[in-house]
From Swiss-Prot:
It is an enzyme of class 3 (hydrolase). Belongs to the glycosyl hydrolase 17 family. Glycans are attached at residues 408, 431, 459, 609, 635. It catalyses: Hydrolysis of (1->3)-beta-D-glucosidic linkages in (1->3)-beta-D-glucans. PANTHER family: GLUCAN 1,3-BETA-GLUCOSIDASE, GLUCAN ENDO-1,3-BETA-GLUCOSIDASE BTGC. Its EC number is 3.2.1.39. One of its GO terms (cellular component) is plasma membrane. It is a single-pass type II membrane protein. This is Probable glucan endo-1,3-beta-glucosidase btgC.
Length: 688
């Protein structure tokens, strides 16, 4: 997921769709065979209340509400598109966008590894064409509720990511006494300090230790960081930036900055290092993420300039401390105290590194008492076709100093195997793919598949490293059949800003290279990329073997009782339609709902009250799953759920009334199902 101001709109040239008269019933029938729900109960067109719940609760009566098509006010058009799989910064972040400093760090490289997050940061993209959004609920959807009040764009400032940071994990026996016993997803930064950096003598493995200590973040010597790059640090934005929520700077790199910022502190405080090792955008690479000119040093102005530097320094200290703490607070072992009493008592120690975890607990497998307990949760059901996943601690180059834990990945996979047979990864750094493969082997899981992920960056060094590691993984694999395919890049076009044409060319070249390598090795695997639904066009469809779109109704401001239908309709109109006449498969690569933290009304607008628009909450998450999961399972709709586990370190990016960054998991960071949350059992039917 990425970026602030996530916008949903129809693609170029589709303005005729703005009126119902231009939409024919033929479109309705065209997609009947792929609808994840079936026609059934009628809806009240005035209030959207159906006689039955679920996607199946709508008939053609919804046409009564389809007639509104006012011209959009320019002030309501968002300037960029994003999904929530990758971002951790923006207007929804600390300080309403973290004036200048953090944004310059995080607006362009959302799910990067390590130092890449800090290099080549861009400012607000002013030249991104405004999206022409259109409420896609309506008459031609066989199960769509009465559409909400018409909007021309569904924007939201978001800052979270599935792979920007991994699904949270704890060391074995790590104390989580500070987590709420009633609803751990509702705690805030002051309730749950996530790191006690002074106590982390052995590494970043106390995810829940604390900000409660007065110790400063761990000292970092930038000269010891691999691929350290320093592009300098801009202290403050110009006066006109960040004034409107709907024009917030893309926050694509927030998660990467948080996950790997330790590797670039030298760039914040020091001078230039070798340009070749920098992770800034490569001129002409075609994947640059925005317009640097939007963030400039303040003009000379006496006290104003001085105050700007002071404020900048303070914000820099706060953000760096939070980010470093988030990275260092990353843990490797058991996420809580759910281990059985028969488990090794040594695993209840307060802190364990990856090496210590293995030394104490051995290489966990299906016969380990701890694993047996994790794999026997009657409240988990295998009803998700796929789940997005990134292990904790795989930010490069931080992982070179603090390696992620194999046992931690094995614990995660023990849980994930009860939810899905299909896991999507986002990158190849830090042996994350190899650890997942090892976990599957140790757990003796026979039906789990993996979508390989390759992070594509504006910096050729990063992309090259990721692709080369993909080749090594494939070459070393004992059985290629465990892989479902390779996803080359996630939301690379979104991060390209206005330079989508050049970015698309670069992205397609990378995809073609991977295809050529597979062909040379006689490997029959599809090669795809994932991006916003409205970033797909015929050219990209032709290049990809599978069309993968990230679609999040929450950031469209869609009320939850209409969210499932809206998601399906948006996917149909933006993605499925592009594959007509081809044999291309379509997959929703990210979809989910946060369990708490406020509400989003889309368009970058402030909600008039706490119940307007899309409301985050456990009840709402239950409703979205109730309306989506089993119907999609029955009808074969292929998607990846975002996500399995909360990522509590992201709490540093919550701000104001937008406090959902750390609350997208079905489970808390200790792998406990959230209180009150109910995963549908779909009558015993399971995903295959």
């Amino acid at each position: 997921m990425s970026g602030p101001n996530r916008t949903y709109s129809f693609g170029e040239g589709d303005d005729s769709l703005a009126h119902p008269s231009s939409r024919t019933h033929a479109m309705h029938s065209q997609y009947d065979d792929v609808s994840p729900i079936s026609d059934g109960a009628r809806m009240n067109p005035m209030n959207g209340q159906g006689m039955d719940h679920g996607l199946a609760s709508v008939l053609e009566d919804g046409r009564q509400g389809w007639g509104r098509s006012p011209e959009p006010s320019p002030s309501l058009l968002t300037g960029s598109s994003a999904t929530p799989g990758m971002d951790n910064l923006g207007p929804g972040a600390v300080g309403g966008g973290i004036s200048g400093i953090a944004l310059s760090v995080a607006n362009s490289h959302d799910r990067l590894s390590g130092v890449e997050a800090l290099m080549g940061t861009d400012g607000q993209e002013a030249n991104i064409p405004a999206e022409r959004g259109l409420s896609t609920t309506g008459s031609d959807n066989p199960y769509v509720p009465e559409p909400p009040e018409h909007r021309y764009s569904y924007g939201s400032n978001i800052a979270l990511g599935a792979a920007a940071a991994p699904a949270g994990q704890l060391t074995p026996g790590q104390s989580v006494s500070h987590l709420s016993s009633t609803n751990p997803s509702q705690r805030n930064l002051y309730d749950i300090p996530y790191q006690d950096v002074g106590g982390l003598n052995a590494g970043p493995y106390q995810r829940h230790s604390a900000y409660s200590s007065n110790d400063l973040p761990v000292d970092i010597n930038p000269d010891e960081i691999v691929d350290d790059g320093d592009d300098g640090f801009v202290p403050a934005p110009n006066s006109g930036s960040g004034a409107r929520k709907s024009q917030a700077i893309p926050a694509a790199a927030g998660g990467a900055a948080a996950g790997g910022v330790l590797g670039n502190l030298g760039g914040l405080f020091g001078g230039k290092s070798a340009a070749d090792t920098s992770y800034g955008p490569v001129p002409g690479a075609g994947l640059e993420a925005g317009e640097k000119g939007r963030w400039v040093k303040p003009k000379p102005g006496g006290g104003n300039k001085k105050r700007g530097w002071i404020v900048g320094a303070i914000l820099a200290f706060i953000i760096i401390g939070a980010i470093v703490g988030g990275a260092v607070g990353g843990t490797i072992g058991h996420r809580g105290n759910e281990e059985p009493s028969s488990a090794s008592s040594a695993s209840s120690s307060s802190t364990q590194t990856a090496t210590e975890d293995t030394s104490v607990n051995g290489d966990l497998d299906k016969n380990s008492a701890e694993i047996k307990a994790l794999m026997n949760n009657k409240n988990l059901h295998k009803v998700f076709p796929g789940i997005d996943y990134t292990p904790w601690g795989v930010q490069y180059p931080l992982c070179l100093k603090y390696p992620p834990s194999q046992n931690n990945v094995t614990r995660d996979m023990a849980v994930l195997t009860q939810l899905t047979n299909n896991v999507r990864l986002y990158g190849t750094d830090c042996n994350q793919t190899e650890m997942v493969l090892h976990a599957i082997d140790k757990l003796e899981i026979k039906d789990m598949k993996i979508w390989l992920g390759v992070w594509i960056d504006s910096n050729e060094t990063t992309s090259r490293r990721q692709i080369d590691q993909l080749y090594k993984i494939i070459d070393d694999a004992k059985d290629i059949s465990i892989f479902n395919g390779a996803i080359v890049g996630n939301e690379a076009l979104y991060r390209a800003g206005s330079d989508k044409t050049s970015a698309q060319t670069t992205l397609i070249n990378y995809m073609q290279e991977v295809k050529d390598h597979f062909k040379k090795k006689n490997i029959d695997l599809p090669v795809a990329t994932s991006d916003l639904g409205d970033n797909w066009d015929a050219t990209l469809v032709q290049a990809a073997d599978v069309v993968m779109a990230n679609v999040h109704p929450f950031f469209g401001g869609i009320p939850v009782d209409q969210a499932a239908a809206w998601t399906w309709r948006f996917w149909q109109d933006h993605n499925v339609a592009l594959t007509k006449g081809t044999n291309k498969k379509q997959i929703i690569s990210e979809v989910g709902w946060p369990s708490g933290g406020g509400n989003d009304c889309g368009q970058g607008a402030n909600c008039p009250n706490d119940t307007a628009g899309a409301v985050a909450g456990v009840d709402e998450l239950n409703k979205f799953m109730e309306d989506w999961v089993c119907q999609a399972l029955d009808n074969g709709t292929d998607y990846f759920w975002f996500e399995a586990f909360d990522e509590p370190w992201k709490i540093v990016y919550n701000t104001g009334k937008e406090n959902w960054e750390d609350k997208w998991g079905l489970m808390d960071s200790a792998r406990n199902l959230k209180p009150g949350l109910k995963i549908p059992d779909c009558g015993g039917k399971t995903a295959t």
